[in-house]
Amino acid sequence: MLEDALVPDDKLIYVSPENLYYCYANDTIDQDDKWTSIQPQQGYIPILSANLRAYKIELLKKLRFSGQNNVSPSIKKEKKNLEPNKKITTKPTESTGSKKYLIPEQFIPDSLEKQLRTLTVILKDALYLGKNNRFIKENEVVSDDTRLLILDEFLKLIIPNYIDSLANWTLVDLNKGTDDESLLYLRFNESGTQSMISFYKKHSKMAKYMEIHYDTNTEKYINDNFKDDGDEDNVEAEQSHSVGEILKSMETAFEKARSQVGTFKGDINDDQDDKINYKIDYNTLLDIPSDSLEQLTKEILNFRTKVIDIEKQKQLRQQYEDNERRQKHMTQLFEKLRKGTKSNDSNRNMDIESTDTINDSDSEEDDDEEDEDDLAIEKRKEEKRKEEEARKYRALLKDYETTIEPHLHLLSQQYKQNLEYEKELAANREANVKDLLRQANDIYYDKDRSFKDREEQEDKLDREKYGDIIIEDIVIDDDRKGQKKLLEKDKKVKKAGEPAIKINLAFKKAMDNSIQDKRDKAEDIEPVSQPIEARSTNRYAALKEKRVVDELVKELLGVYEDDVVAYVFEILEKPEMSDEKKQSELVTEMEDLFDKEGAVQFAEQVFKALDEA
């Protein structure tokens, strides 16, 4: 099924409502591949694949809630043909003609042989079963099933060896105002070739009642198999006899159908025929005039069946509302359960109590809603829908007025200015010149635009004159100057008698050693940094101030734990361990609280924050 296919929700899928109705009529509604397609086809409309289920439910709901299914008569006929125990009208389907009838979609030939044995007959005048037929009274409409029975009798008269020679037939109406016609398509069996030729030979000139049409291949097929016996008089006699017999048979069929109740009641509702077969006792209507009997019969049938239809529609509507309420209640319950699993153990009891209270209130509200009238519920839903649509409309209108329209106006002005740029430049020439003069005389205006080129040129001249300066010499000279200053300071300290001689001597000795190392290695001197322990202490203090570890513990545990944070810093502040060993130990210790993956992620984030501190 296409609904279960792995189709993204934002992709298009093509559906055919007519094929869906066809599946509904033939009880194959679950076969979605018969009315959906992932490729565009003729008669299919595109929708989002995420809306496929809602679209199907909406169409089926319209089918069930309407008084009659919106299925074409041809589909209904096919459904009845698939069920041999059903009645076409009031007469059982014992005749062979009902079995030979096909809907136009199924009658289309699938081979050249079938096309050769197909004739098209245009029925007119008495043979046309529409409103202009001579046998149909005013304001009298023949039902579709009755037309099929009458045409079945008609074909038995005009086709020799009807049962064995005729394969299938179908009927298509052409509405052309007052000159209405019906197209009767006949397909003969391979053994019925002579019957087809005999039918063509007898009735090809009956232009008043019917016209026979065929394509060039069929004409060639008839001419190849046609044998002229030269007996034209007998042909005309048989033809005139056939016309009189046909007209008499048609009149008899109409009278017989008219005597059966419900045949001439207009557009018959097939769904009502399936639901109920209501019989009228005409003995109670003996006092009614004959001209009013037909209308009264219609009203009685409509009234009796309407009550049952309304009751069934109400039951379906009630069932639909109950399903919606149950679905809403289950959704709320699942939402509360999902939220309850995320809550802490300390708040779990309170959540359960509040959930019970909410469930009780929801059940009471549902009971109250069930007592309300269905019409009131529908009106309330309609009002909410209209309010939501009005709110969305106002939001869109406000966005258009405040954002889109001003932006479009600005773009329009800019476009007009660009079209008339030269005119604008000429018109504002005086103002532009004044602006340039003001900026030229402004003390803050940068008049020196080529300072970079000048500096590069001066640097090049300096290098040619003095050469490149080695960084080592500059560093050593600076160290010597610093050493000289320290010696002078030591002399002052000796004179003052302050007890800082050891510290200064040690510092002096360190400076001498550093200068000697720089001379030997010729490397850059880095500024004297703080001791490693002092730097580590500063890093841990900065990490504590940022409270990164606190946030990570709270995020992973769901609750802030002081003991866990203190234990983490206890591991980090061990002086005898390197950062790699600390990280490994932290992962090992945190596996008891978190899982393996969570412990690794926690340690990586802690040391990342420690490096940034």
From Swiss-Prot:
Signal peptide: none annotated. It is found in: Cytoplasm; Nucleus. InterPro entries: PWI_dom. Residues 333-384 are annotated as: Disordered. The keyword Coiled coil applies. GO terms for cellular component: cytoplasm; spliceosomal complex. Residues 293-332, 367-443 form a coiled coil. One of its GO terms (molecular function) is RNA binding. Its main location: cytoplasm. It comes from the Eukaryota. Residues 359-375 have a biased composition (Acidic residues). Component of the U1 snRNP particle, which recognizes and binds the 5'-splice site of pre-mRNA. Together with other non-snRNP factors, U1 snRNP forms the spliceosomal commitment complex, that targets pre-mRNA to the splicing pathway. Component of the U1 snRNP particle, a subcomplex of the spliceosome. Belongs to the SNU71 family. This is U1 small nuclear ribonucleoprotein component SNU71.
